[in-house]
Design a protein with these regions (language model features):
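Di-metal (Zn2+ and/or Mg2+/Mn2+) metal-binding site signature of metallo-dependent hydrolases
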Residues: 10-32
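Divalent metal-dependent hydrolysis catalytic cores, especially in the metallo-beta-lactamase
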Residues: 22, 38-67, 80-93, 120-131, ...
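Active-site loop-to-helix "anion-binding N-cap" substructures in soluble metabolic enzymes
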Residues: 27-31, 43, 57-63, 131, ...
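Charged helix-capping and loop-helix junction motifs
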Residues: 33-36, 67-70, 109-111, 186-193
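Surface-exposed amphipathic alpha-helices with a cationic face
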Residues: 72-75, 139-146, 223
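Divalent metal-binding pocket/active-site signature
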Residues: 87, 94-110, 115-191
């Protein structure tokens, strides 16, 4: 009774779940338009992705709302591959902005994020730097709404990460990138964000596994410590 598939010499594997993706095929989710969303999603669907979380970099509220409106509409379609919207920012540490747009970066503001969350239920993940003023309140609020709180673009040390984990931050965005490792100030040594996340056994991590953002030796270390499930 098993289904036979003629793979013509190729492999049949489960479809990929893209949890952090800014676009593809010339389409950028930051544009917020249905055309951009479809262009990017179709490009990924042609190469083995079957589910996707469109990702926005640090954005203004109108940009978030436009993308959320498009995302909500497309999620309602039959067999939609979109699982939810991922916001990478804009509550990030300016010193670790990296490729983010600095003009959009700020501290968490409940007068801003509460209406966004209440109005747009398509948002399923929101990244933030936990050391920012208001970040713990933000983490508790969004996790209470079923949104994954993730650590990103941060200078957090151990106590920041420990407190953040207790506040609901259970994931780390592009682990090792835009976050410090072990370091010192004068003669004193401090755990960086990386080591602190390793010490939170149940925290999950995502890695840009291209051998460039994170070298192969470090990829092996992440796998050895966190394992395939985390």
């Amino acid at each position: 009774g098993a289904e036979l598939i003629d793979a013509k010499g190729m492999y049949v594997v489960p479809g990929g779940v893209e949890i952090h993706c800014h676009g593809g095929g010339g389409g950028d989710f930051m544009e917020g338009t249905e055309e951009a969303f479809r262009t990017a999603i179709n490009a990924h669907m042609k190469h083995g992705t079957t589910s996707i979380f469109p990702t926005l970099s640090s954005s203004t509220v109108p940009m978030i709302e436009q993308a959320a409106e498009t995302c909500t509409k497309m999620m309602a379609e039959k067999d939609s591959p979109i699982l939810g919207l991922h916001l990478e920012g804009h509550y990030l540490n300016m010193a670790m902005a990296g490729g983010q747009m600095p003009e959009n970066i700020k501290n968490p503001d409940p007068n801003e994020y509460i209406p966004i969350v209440e109005n747009w239920h398509c948002i399923k993940r929101w990244d933030a730097a936990p050391e920012l003023p208001g970040a713990m309140q933000f983490g508790k609020y969004i996790t209470g709404k079923g949104i994954l709180a993730s650590v990103a673009h941060t200078q957090a040390e151990f106590e920041d990460i420990r407190t953040a984990y207790e506040a609901g931050y259970t994931h780390a965005t592009h682990f090792y990138n835009a976050m410090p490792g072990f370091h010192k100030r004068r003669e004193y040594k401090y755990e960086g964000t990386v080591e602190s996340i390793y010490l939170m056994d149940d925290m999950t991590v995502e890695v840009v596994a291209d051998g460039i953002h994170v070298p192969p030796t470090i990829l092996r270390l992440v796998y050895k410590i966190k394992g395939v499930e985390r």
